[in-house]
Regions:
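Sec-dependent signal peptide recognition
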Residues: 2-9
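Periplasmic c-type cytochrome electron-transfer domains
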Residues: 18-359
Length: 359
């Protein structure tokens, strides 16, 4: 996933038509053009090629490599980064509680903290137990590319519930081995997951419903994607493959939390316009916490789950939602400031050969 993210960013910026940017002056345009121009020399790495996050790229590796901020943040920005990190790691609890700033979890939920799914800001894994901790199972039916929530189970199956309420079910996975022959006649074995729903506590799910297991992605570099000018994305639309490069792309326009049409950037089907909406959606659907994006204090509970609405929520007289915009903005800043680590082995001959194929 890291490689895919870096490749997308590199390909996107290397193919920009900077002449269409009216926010750049001539000097800036020329500078951007030189930096993003496609290379024709694949015998050696380009200057600064190892800097996946530009001038702010961090050079730390190891188990905390994905949790580093851009190294060109100011002192004040680093303070905001640490505050956002605290909220990202914060463990939420059910209402009512003496810590009113941390209650409101559920009633149905899949995680109690952002960090639970994005462990050390990295990628999740396929479930090893019946209740996934870093994956969600989307359920419903698709109308073209839009997911229509399931009448009973909502947008995703919730594997946990607060005391006094049944969770929606559990999941078991077994793996089948598949193999294919490489050109050098060596067999490569891959594991193919088959998952099964167990203990559905609110009735069966019809076979016509779509089920999609999603592993939580790592969150490094998302600020770079969020920072791309919408006009640059729109100018690269080529739905009829007019440039004959074999790639047809269509920009997806979605509605943000304020009712405005925006370019879709995040999610499997580019369903989310920015990190603020992405964060708010995750709070409501994954943890059952209301905010200005997802306003239901009962999260993904549906009208058919009447008992779900009998539990207290975390909205109090001093707030209109369980998660304030201030908390959301700190988390968004934290996510936006996570730097991809420095690329390694950029001068390796196999890496350069792969780069040539990619170009």
């Amino acid at each position: 996933m890291v490689l895919k993210l870096i490749c997308f960013i590199l390909f996107f910026f290397y193919s920009l038509n900077v002449s269409s940017r009216n926010d750049l002056n001539e000097v800036e345009r020329e500078k951007v053009f030189k930096v993003t121009a496609l290379t024709k020399n694949f015998s050696k790495a380009e200057r600064s090629e190892a800097l996946s996050g530009g001038a702010g790229t961090v050079k730390k590796f190891g188990k905390n490599a994905f949790s580093q901020h851009f190294n060109n943040l100011s002192f004040e920005q680093r303070q905001d980064f640490l505050i956002g990190n605290g909220f990202f790691r914060k463990v939420w609890i059910a209402s009512p509680a003496s810590t009113t700033a941390s209650d409101g979890l559920g009633p149905l939920y899949n995680a109690r903290a952002c960090q639970s799914c994005h462990i050390k800001d990295g990628r999740g894994h396929l479930p090893r137990e019946e209740k996934p901790l870093s994956a969600v199972l989307k359920v419903g039916n698709y109308n073209n590319i839009n997911l229509i929530p399931h009448k009973v189970y909502g947008k995703q199956l919730q594997f946990f519930a607060i005391p006094g309420l049944l969770s929606e079910g559990s999941l078991s996975i077994n793996f089948k081995n598949s193999n294919f022959m490489k050109k050098n006649l060596n067999k490569v074995f891959l594991k193919y997951p088959n998952y099964k729903l167990n203990k559905l506590n609110y009735g069966p799910i019809e076979t016509s419903a779509s089920l999609s297991l999603r592993i939580s992605p790592q969150v490094i570099g998302v600020g770079l994607l969020d920072a791309i000018e919408s006009s640059d994305i729109i100018n690269k639309e080529d739905k009829n493959d007019n440039n004959k490069d074999g790639i047809s792309g269509i920009v997806r326009l979605v509605t943000d939390n304020k009712g405005n049409k925006k370019v879709g950037r995040f999610g499997v089907r580019a369903s989310t316009p920015n990190l603020f909406v992405q964060t708010g959606t995750a709070f409501m659907h994954d943890m059952g916490l209301s905010n200005s994006v997802g306003v239901n204090a009962f999260g993904d509970c549906t009208n058919d789950q009447k008992k779900c609405y009998k539990f207290p929520n975390g909205v109090n007289k001093n707030s209109s939602h369980e998660v304030s915009d201030e908390v959301m903005e700190k988390i968004v800043f934290y996510l936006s400031s996570l730097s991809p680590p420095k690329r390694r082995n950029v001068s390796d001959k196999d890496v350069l050969y792969g780069k040539k194929i990619f170009y």
